[in-house]
Amino acid sequence: MLNQFELCSAPVTAAAYEKCDSIVLFLCKECAPAVPQLELPVEVEKAVEAYLAAHDDVYDVGALTSFVLPTEGGLLQLIIAGCGEGSDCKPNNFRKAAGEAARALHKAKARQAVCAAPILLNPQRGFYAQAIAEGLFLGGYTFNRFKSEAKEAPLCAVKLLSSAEDSAKLVEVAEIEAEAVCFTRDLVNNPGNIVTPQVMVEAALAMGKELPLEVTVLDEVLLKDRGMEAILAVGRGSENPPRMIALQYNGAGDAPYTAFVGKGVTFDSGGISIKPDDNMGEMKDDMTGAADVLGAMRAIARLGLPCNVIGVLACAENMPDGRAQRPGDIVRAANGKTIEVVSTDAEGRMVLADGVWYACRLGAKKVIDIATLTGAVIIALGNETSGIVANNDELVEQLKLAGKYAGENYWQLPALPECKEAVKSDVADLLNSAGRAGGVITGGLFIGEFVDKGLPWAHIDIGGTSTATKTEGVKVKGGTGFGTLTLIKLAGML
C-alpha cells in the first residue's frame, strides 16, 4: 500500500467492475472509439457516450470530469480523465491525468475503484499501465507529519484494467519507483531541525540493513584525513558536522560503476554571505540532490537492477558563526586544487567538489552529480526543466531519454571553454562563484574540475524543479522528488 492506494492489475472484463464505487476512465481522443470494448456497466457507457458527443475539451491533459450515476448497485462516481489527442497522447499525459485522478478519488473517499483506458486494450501498451500507476501513487502523496489532527484518506483498492501481459509486473515496478520518489519527498519536506547530515547517515544505514547496499560513512575526522577541506569548510559554522556517505550497489558483477553524487546541504542560510530572510525557510530543500540519490539507490536495490551504481551524498549544513568560512578564504579540496571563496552562499559546488572526487576514488567510471545549485537555472529554464552541463554528449542523451521515460524534462547548456576561464582565480586555482553571467554553466564547470580527467560526467541543476508551489499532475505542493525517477530509469539503461 502506498499513499492509501492498494493497486493491482486485472484483465478487462465486465466482472471487474462489480462492487466498485468509482470508475476512472483515461481517455485520449484517438482511443475514444474503443470505449465500448472496455465492457463498462451499461449506465456508465451510455453516460460516457453522451458526454463525449457534446464536449470536445474532455481530452485536455489532466482535465477531470466527474459524475455521480445511479446504478443497480447504488451510486457510482465516474471520472473521465483527459490524456490528450494526436501525437500528444504520450505516457506522461496518462501519468499526469492519474495524479489528478488520485486526488479526486481521495476527495470522494472512494473505497473500491476501477481504472480503465482504451489504450490498455492493446497488449503492447503495458508501459501506459505503469505510467498510470506511477501517477496514482505520486498524485496521492501527502505530507502531514506535523499536523496535530492529520486526516488520512480511506484505503482505496484500485483495479487497473489492462490486456497487456506485462501490466502486473510493471505496476509492481511503478509502486517501487513511486515509493522511492515519495521517500525523497519526505526527506525534502522535513525541516532543517529534523533532517541534519547525521539523519541522512541514519537513513542510509537503515537502507543498508534492509537492502543489498554497502554503506560507508566519513565523519569530520575521516574527511580531514582524506583532505576533503571543501566540504569541511562549508560545514565549519554548524553544530551539525558534515558527512560524506557512500552506498554501493553491485548488480552486474565486474561491470564498471556509475556514480550518482547528490548535494546534501540540509539547510542553507548562505553562511556569512547570508541570504535574505524572505523565504529562507525554503532552504531546507537544499539537500534535494542527496535525497534524490538516496531514493534512487533505494529503488535500484529493491528492483534488483542489473547494474553497478555508487550513490554519494555530500552532506553539510551551511551556517554563520565565529568558526564559519569567510568570503576571501582559500581552501584546498581533496584533489589538491585550491578554491577562493568568493561567496559562502556558493557552497553546494564545494561539497560536490569533494563528493565527485570521492566517487572517482571509489572506482566510478562515469559520474553524474545532481544539485539545487543555482537560482540562475530558474531564470534560464523555468520550473519545469532542469539544466545539464556535461563533457559527454552520449551521457547527456542517456539522461534525456531517462528523463523522457520518467516524465522529467532536461536541457543541455553549452560548456564553452570561455566559461571555464571564468571560474579561474587570480590568487587560487578556482573561484567558487564566477558571478551572474552564465551561472548555471560556470557552477557546473566548477564541479567538473574535480572529476578525474577523461571520465564521462554530467551535472544536473534542479534549482527550479526541486519544489512545486502548487499541486498539479503528479506534483504535490512542496518537494517534488524531481530527479529520483530519472536516476532510476537511467540505472535501468546502464
Positions of the model-derived regions?
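Short amphipathic alpha-helical segment within the helicase RecA-like ATPase core
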Residues: 1-264
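A generic structural signal for tightly packed, nonpolar segments enriched in small/aliphatic residues
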Residues: 1-2, 59, 200-494
